[in-house]
Amino acid sequence: GSSLNLLYQDTVRKMGIDPSRIKPTKTTFKGVIPGVEANCTGSVTLEVVFGSPDNFRSEELIFDIVPFRSGYHALLGRTAFAKFNAVPHYAYLKLKMPGPRGVITVNGNTERSLRTEEHTAALAAEVQSSLSRQFSSPATKRPDTVKRARSNLQQDHLARSEQA
């Protein structure tokens, strides 16, 4: 998953991205929703710009669109960092990369980061609770029931993100 650039379906809607720009994809990955393989709903190529008007970098990145909610708008993967020659420093909430007129530094916001982390933790707890309920019944010993539970969970997250 860390090699993917992810864009959440709600973010796509809020950005007003024309649906004709979204291409079909069969990309799947694990690790965002515990115990569930996620299927991307499409992909879109977007221009991403970092810096200031006099010192900036611009690259086109392919984002895979995911059908669930998050406290984030998008996640950049290793390929994005490599394309920009960027180095993230998570403890200081900074991203640095070379620019045409010197180093470009993108600063994070500590307060907003903490709020987002709390929101994401609440979503993870909700998913974990839902999985626990689904897998605690005796019927889940059958493999087809496990597949159904995962599918129901993904559909539930899709429905919630469309309502938001």
Predicted segment positions?
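Aspartic protease core domain of the pepsin/retropepsin superfamily
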Residues: 3-163
